[in-house]
UniProtKB/Swiss-Prot annotation:
GO terms for molecular function: thiazole synthase activity. Homotetramer. Forms heterodimers with either ThiH or ThiS. This is Thiazole synthase. Pathway: Cofactor biosynthesis; thiamine diphosphate biosynthesis. It is an enzyme of class 2 (transferase). 1-deoxy-D-xylulose 5-phosphate binds at G157, A184, G185, N206, T207. It is found in: Cytoplasm. Its EC number is 2.8.1.10. It comes from Rhizobium rhizogenes (strain K84 / ATCC BAA-868). CDD domains: ThiG.
Amino acid sequence: MLALYGTEVASRLLLGTARYPSPAILAEAVRQSATEIVTVSLRRETAGGRNGGAFFEMIRTLGVRILPNTAGCHGVSEAVLTAKMAREVFQTNWIKLEVIGNHDTLQPDVFGLVEAARILASEGFEVFPYTTDDLVVAERLLDAGCKVLMPWCAPIGSAAGPLNLSALRAMRAHFPDVPLIVDAGIGRPSHATTVMELGFDAVLLNTAVAGARDPAAMAGAFAKAIDAGRLAFTAGMLEPRDMAVPSTPVIGKAVFA
């Protein structure tokens, strides 16, 4: 089980709800993924008007927990205001905090992120910060009151997969007791398996599933890949060696003179 701010979930796959071909396909992807947590943008809920309300009701019928996000926010005050509005709309203290610093890469503004996290944590929010793999920033976020970290492995929507395995490995080693959820940049199930084999606690997906030819089938593929990576990590994988090691014992081998 994975514990996030005192809530335990069995699934280690978190699923975004944007960019699906239709609500019905999204619903089936959620079912096939077996996720227990979906992210929802306040902008999607409010901008859709009556349709936005129908979307929210559809999500609620799936029996999953909603993690609102501040997607599209480019400053501290905007992110904080959006988080407060999301708490009212979705009736939860959970917030996936995004403060974007660059339009092209959608890289987090880590300075604004830490400031916004501190403000929100002081007001009772349980913050899931979208951040980089920088250890110093991670320390600042924990100091600000975050109990979960969500580092990217590549730019949002890039499908590039983990670009810096050394940094991700270092983050896992440096924060052995902090829930770490890889957020952004995953493109293939094998990417998800790779980061789970490093010991990360979960993966958040959106574009890799929503943009697939068959989103529901891809959601199922990712669910299996994440489970496989987690099982491999807990089972204890062999470390690579430079030289061969025979797999067949030589004791008792016949000797022909």
